[in-house]
């Protein structure tokens, strides 16, 4: 049993293949492959629940042992979001032969197993998206029809995208009946590339090109070739572009008139002797040459020098000259001597003697030559030694010796040190033939006069090196610093760029890359794009980050609202053409091709009407009518069949089924039953209707005159009739359904009344009938309407309405067209505001807004976004930066200004830890370790640590807080900076308004190991009467009291003491100055009186006062805590008091410390704060009120001193407070009245 693979392809593929018969290459070519990997059908069942083969075992309720004959069938079509199993397989379909039984598997790499693979070729641009329907079927060979069918075991539907690739994509389907695994891939055929397999590239090396193809299908020229088609040869390197060419790479073929290896030499005129050329066939003469061929010598005197014996030569013409001879000579060339010595030719005292050849010179000593004009060289051979230079003299020589030698021939050693040649040296040593200088450091050279160049490679980054003696100095280029100019000065360190600008450090400067909407050197200018008023027709303008936006009125559109909205009045709206649908194609520019929608069926041609309603009409073929050309015209309506014939309607034709005995197109001809001459023994045949009659002679009887005995024989009665001999004739008794003299006429009772419905034709067949149904009907009596909706023809969830041989698709919302394949483009009306992108969706649209816009149609403007370090934050965004909180408001970034301190790190071997770039992990100092050990703890610091303020004088800008911790509940390794970091990260600390710059710094108490002093400093006062220091301290107390902070460190706080200045009432009226003046006057009078009394008292008791109070009252550290009051949190009263100095007598309200200071002991109570009352109720609801006492005068109930609490200030603070005591009395009193110290016991 072999099942042959089959495949069907879309009409598009066939069309492209026909085109390929005459085109050089197809526009696209590839194939889709599917390979089955495994199948598991444990129960051997079908999707319907029935067994594949045989009945179910009633005992075990399982299928029989006979397994399924499993094969697979695929259908590949265009991408569908809602897959319809009906409709054509537009990309192709195919099936495998029977692969196996219920369960089987194949190796994925078995590429030779064609039995499990289905290959669907395509010749259109692969669209990447697809829908694949995979069916596992049980083979069923219908022997009666010869067709190959199958019953569905399991069906998988896969929609997605796949690009051409050699790699397989493995998919798995887990169905309720069976599970199977398969793999798919799309591969381009040879020479085709790209995502659509529509880029053709075939390597070639011929006249039309010389190239190979890379993996993307791009042409890669072979070596020596260039050009888009790689058919331009690359000539020999250096070959003249103007005068050379080549057809073979590496050659250089010269044009006519040019020569040379590179075709850069012109060919001169033939015969040109002393000339050159610039263009071919020229003859440009060399100097002193002339003539057409440059063969005429214009300087014979210079070339030949023909004049002898001192004659003077003159050029007189081309190739002509004249010699002017000296006295005593003649001839053309002065070659004849007449009186040679007459001209005194012998020089330098030489004696002239005439001879037959002219004259001879007898030269003086030291001279030689024909005329004694050559000085004899007395320096040859060189008589000077030790590289001395010989100077030739007349009849002698002179040696110029090197400095270390002397003498006539430089043989005597000279003492060079006598001339002090060494410039920068310790000493000079004379040597044979020279000397040696022992140079000072930094000098070199034979005479130590050359400064050693210490600048070699020292100054970096373009720095100018100034060479010094035994050293150097670098003059750095702008933007660099350091001894060697090795450090780039970072001009961006000060963060000069505003409004989110990104700073780029440059040489000796910086450059700000401004975010959209800002400009200027530091991005300080906010660009207002609406300043020029670009919006028209009353539109509102909004300035955005990098552009402007015009909010148009209802009837206008465009960037500037300058265009009237179309409303389909100017350009036509989207026309829904019911006659066509678009399919993927590579043969059209848009990638789509229109094909018929088949709305008029197979018997009509669609004609679309040009309006937006999608109306159409069908032009029907001959023989059909109806709206969709679905009705076959009844050609039997005129009853063309005669003689009782039955008319069968056909397409634009009819067929007559004649009654027995008749024939012809319309049954108009009686069949001649005598044509076979049935009568025997000379009987005469008479033709009847569907019968004959024989007139017998000579006593013959029977139907055919063949019997002597009876009128009946075996052929007398037809169709089972019984013959009865009645003497001279016979009679036939016919069987049911037949009549006539010889039972040859069939009764028409089977079709009476007509059993066939819906216009069908009834045809009598023996004793039965057959109904010939009209198109669109089926069944024995044509009573069943054919389901024209199967397979489902409507796309996109359209509803199919079945008619009589027609159907109609009622489309879901958002779709149109005859088969609901057209998605109505809601973006056609441009609903989105200008600058936004409209995305068409099913029955709707979606607007993609540009930055700065929002709303369903992007018509609303949001605040300007902020740009932070290349990141964009939307308007209203909030984020954390270390311990600070930042906000984006209309393009401006505002952050709280809390000093965050150094980052914690773990000490590693490299010393870098996890610190930012430019910082090192520095070990925590021992005095900074709060809960030991802290050996592994570190802090990230740069080379230059900023100064941290760890204490302050309490005022409106600063408060001092002392925290006492229960260290038993704290983990090990807690540092002082970690405690400070926890306080900075409290919500109440880091969310203070950005109008204040806040610093929270900490240090370990020197008096108690479980206390930490915290200084909270604010750079400026709050606005509208707010005091940020009081707000922060109150919030911290409230948070600590409720244990709201999720921190073990904050939860370990046992006591809080606050020292801060009481805020002044901002609403002081005009009476305040008056009251102050009155009080000041009274105070001055009292002070004067007290001062006079103190002078007299001091004179009397100076000796006793010295014994009682030998030291200054301001030298004791206790005075620094004189204003500290310890309070229980159940009764928080902020008081101010002044204590008497040590040595004062009890009970004295006023006493004199010195002549300049008077201390008044005053008790003042301030109202309880809200935080104090809340803390009292939550922590100590039943604690009695605590007694208020002076810090240094507290007594127990039995009169003994209460142990003093360790003071919070260190020695430096004591010195500061001591110096603060020595201020004028008025200033001292004001500060004492405004200072409040509170202690909170937690």
UniProtKB/Swiss-Prot annotation:
* Chief location of this protein within or outside the cell: membrane
Sorted alphabetically, the keyword list is:
Calcium, Cell membrane, Developmental protein, Disulfide bond, EGF-like domain, Glycoprotein, Membrane, Notch signaling pathway, Repeat, Signal, Transmembrane, Transmembrane helix
**List of glycosylated residues:** 141, 218, 385, 560, 748, 960, 991, 1046
Q: Which GO terms describe its molecular function?
A: calcium ion binding; Notch binding; receptor ligand activity
- What GO terms fall under cellular component here? membrane; plasma membrane
Explain the purpose of this protein. Ligand for multiple Notch receptors and involved in the mediation of Notch signaling. Seems to be involved in cell-fate decisions.
**Name listed for the protein in its UniProt record:** Protein jagged-1a
Taxonomic lineage per UniProt? Eukaryota, Metazoa, Chordata, Craniata, Vertebrata
Gene that produces this protein:
jag1a
């Amino acid at each position: 049993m072999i099942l042959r693979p089959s495949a069907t392809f879309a009409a598009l593929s066939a069309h492209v293949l026909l085109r390929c018969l005459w085109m050089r290459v197809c526009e696209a070519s590839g194939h889709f492959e599917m390979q089955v990997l495994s199948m598991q059908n444990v129960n051997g069942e079908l999707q319907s629940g029935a067994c594949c083969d045989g009945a179910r075992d009633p005992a075990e309720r399982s299928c029989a042992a006979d397994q399924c004959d499993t094969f697979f069938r695929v259908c590949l079509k265009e991408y569908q979001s809602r897959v319809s199993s009906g409709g054509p397989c537009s990309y192709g379909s195919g099936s495998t032969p029977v692969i196996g039984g219920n369960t089987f598997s194949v190796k994925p790499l078995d590429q030779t197993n064609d039995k499990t693979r289905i290959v669907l070729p395509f010749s259109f641009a692969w669209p990447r998206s697809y829908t694949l329907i995979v069916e596992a079927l049980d083979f069923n060979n219908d022997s009666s029809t010869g067709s190959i069918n199958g019953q569905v075991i399991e069906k998988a539907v896969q929609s997605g995208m796949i690009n051409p690739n050699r790699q397989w994509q493995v998919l798995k389907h887990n169905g309720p009946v069976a599970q199977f695994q398969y793999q798919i891939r799309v591969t381009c055929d040879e020479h085709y590339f790209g995502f659509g397999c529509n880029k053709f590239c075939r390597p070639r090396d011929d006249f039309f090109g010389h190239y190979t193809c890379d993996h993307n299908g791009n042409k890669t020229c072979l070596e020596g070739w260039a050009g888009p088609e790689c058919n331009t040869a690359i000539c020999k390197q250096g070959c003249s572009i103007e005068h050379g060419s080549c057809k073979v790479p590496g050659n250089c073929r010269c044009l006519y008139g040019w020569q040379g290896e590179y075709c850069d030499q012109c060919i001169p005129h033939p015969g040109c002797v002393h000339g050159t050329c610039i263009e071919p066939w020229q003859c440009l003469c060399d100097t002193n040459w002339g003539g057409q061929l440059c063969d005429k010598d214009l300087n014979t005197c210079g070339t030949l020098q023909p004049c002898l014996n001192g004659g003077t030569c003159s050029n007189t013409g081309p190739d002509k000259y004249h010699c002017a001879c000296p006295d005593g000579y003649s001839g053309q060339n002065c070659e004849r001597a007449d009186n040679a010595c007459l001209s005194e030719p012998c020089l330098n005292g030489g004696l002239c003697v005439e001879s037959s050849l002219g004259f001879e010179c007898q030269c003086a000593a030291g001279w030689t030559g024909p005329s004694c004009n050559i000085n004899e060289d007395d320096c040859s051979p060189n008589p000077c030694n030790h590289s001395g230079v010989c100077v030739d003299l007349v009849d002698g020589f002179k040696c110029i010796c090197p400095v270390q030698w002397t003498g006539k021939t430089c043989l005597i050693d000279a003492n060079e040190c006598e001339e002090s040649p060494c410039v920068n040296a310790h000493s000079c040593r004379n040597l044979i033939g020279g000397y040696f200088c022992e140079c000072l450091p930094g000098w070199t050279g034979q005479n130590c006069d050359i400064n050693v160049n210490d600048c070699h490679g020292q100054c970096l980054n373009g720095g100018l090196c100034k060479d010094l003696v035994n050293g150097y100095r670098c003059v750095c280029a702008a933007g660099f610093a350091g001894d060697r100019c090795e450090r780039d000065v970072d001009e961006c360190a000060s963060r000069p760029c505003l409004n989110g600008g990104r700073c780029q450090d440059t040489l000796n400067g910086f450059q700000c890359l401004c975010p959209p909407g800002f400009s200027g050197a530091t991005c300080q200018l906010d660009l207002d794009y609406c300043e020029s008023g670009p919006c028209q027709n009353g539109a509102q303008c909004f300035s955005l980050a990098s552009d402007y936006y015009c909010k148009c009125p209802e009837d206008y559109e465009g960037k500037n609202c300058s265009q009237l909205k179309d409303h389909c009045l100017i350009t036509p709206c989207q026309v829904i053409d019911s006659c066509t649908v678009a399919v993927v194609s590579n043969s059209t520019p848009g990638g789509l091709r229109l094909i018929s929608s088949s709305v008029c069926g197979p018997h009509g041609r669609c004609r679309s009407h040009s309006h937006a309603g999608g109306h159409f009409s069908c032009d029907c073929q001959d023989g059909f009518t109806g709206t969709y050309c679905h009705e076959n015209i009844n050609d039997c309506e005129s009853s063309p069949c005669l003689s009782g014939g039955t008319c069968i309607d056909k397409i634009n034709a009819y067929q007559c089924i004649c009654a027995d005995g008749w024939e012809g197109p319309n049954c108009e001809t009686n069949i001649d039953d005598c044509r076979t001459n049935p009568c025997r023994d000379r009987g005469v045949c008479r033709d009847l209707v569907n019968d004959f009659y024989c007139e017998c002679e000579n006593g013959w009887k029977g139907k055919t005159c063949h019997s002597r005995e009876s009128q009946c024989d075996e052929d007398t009665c037809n169709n089972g009739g019984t013959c009865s001999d009645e003497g001279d004739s016979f009679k036939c008794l016919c069987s049911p359904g037949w009549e006539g003299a010889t039972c040859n006429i069939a009764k028409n009772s089977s079709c009476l009344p007509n059993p066939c419905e819906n216009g069908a034709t009834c045809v009598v067949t023996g004793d039965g009938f057959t109904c010939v149904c009209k198109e669109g009907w089926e069944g024995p009596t044509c009573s069943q309407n054919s389901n024209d909706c199967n397979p489902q023809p409507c796309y996109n969830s359209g509803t199919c309405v079945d008619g009589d041989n027609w159907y109609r698709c009622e489309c879901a919302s958002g779709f149109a067209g005859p088969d609901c394949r057209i998605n109505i483009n809601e973006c056609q009306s441009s609903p989105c505001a200008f600058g936004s992108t409209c995305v068409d969706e099913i029955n709707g649209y979606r607007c993609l807004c540009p930055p700065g816009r929002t709303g369903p149609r992007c018509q609303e403007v949001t605040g300007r976004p902020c740009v932070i370090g290349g990141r964009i934050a939307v308007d209203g965004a909030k984020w954390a930066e270390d311990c600070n909180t930042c906000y984006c408001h209309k393009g401006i970034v505002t952050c709280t200004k809390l000093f965050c301190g150094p980052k914690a790190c773990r000490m590693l071997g490299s010393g870098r830890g996890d610190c930012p770039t430019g910082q090192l992990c520095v070990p925590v100092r021992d005095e900074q370790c709060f809960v030991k050990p802290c050996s592994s703890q570190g802090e990230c610091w740069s080379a230059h640590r900023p100064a941290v303020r760890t204490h302050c004088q309490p005022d409106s800008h600063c408060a001092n807080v002392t925290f006492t911790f229960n260290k038993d509940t704290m983990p090990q390794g807690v540092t002082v900076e970690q405690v400070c970091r926890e306080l900075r990260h409290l919500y109440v600390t880091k969310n203070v308004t950005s109008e204040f710059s806040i610093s929270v710094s900490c240090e370990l108490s020197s008096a108690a190991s479980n206390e930490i002093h915290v200084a909270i400093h604010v750079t400026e006062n709050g606005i509208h009467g707010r005091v940020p220091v009081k707000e922060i301290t109150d919030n911290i107390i409230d948070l600590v009291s409720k244990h709201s902070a999720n921190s073990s460190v904050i939860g370990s706080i046992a006591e809080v003491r606050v020292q801060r200045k009481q805020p002044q009432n901002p609403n002081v009226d005009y009476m305040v100055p008056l009251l102050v003046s009155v009080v000041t006057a009274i105070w001055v009078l009292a002070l004067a009186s007290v001062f006079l009394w103190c002078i007299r008292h001091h004179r009397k008791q100076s000796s006793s006062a010295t014994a009682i109070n030998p030291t200054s009252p301001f030298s004791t550290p206790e005075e620094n805590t004189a204003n500290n009051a310890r309070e229980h949190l159940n009764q928080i009263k902020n008081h101010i008091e002044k204590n008497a100095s040590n040595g004062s007598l009890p009970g004295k309200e006023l006493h004199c410390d010195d002549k300049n200071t008077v201390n008044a002991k005053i008790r003042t109570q301030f109202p309880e704060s809200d935080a104090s009352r809340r803390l009292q109720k939550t922590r100590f609801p039943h604690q009695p009120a605590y007694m208020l006492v002076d810090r240094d005068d507290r007594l127990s109930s039995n009169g003994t001193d209460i142990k003093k609490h360790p003071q919070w200030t260190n020695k430096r603070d004591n010195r500061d407070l001591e110096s603060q005591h020595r201020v004028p009395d008025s200033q001292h009193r004001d500060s004492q009245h405004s200072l409040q110290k509170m202690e909170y016991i937690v």
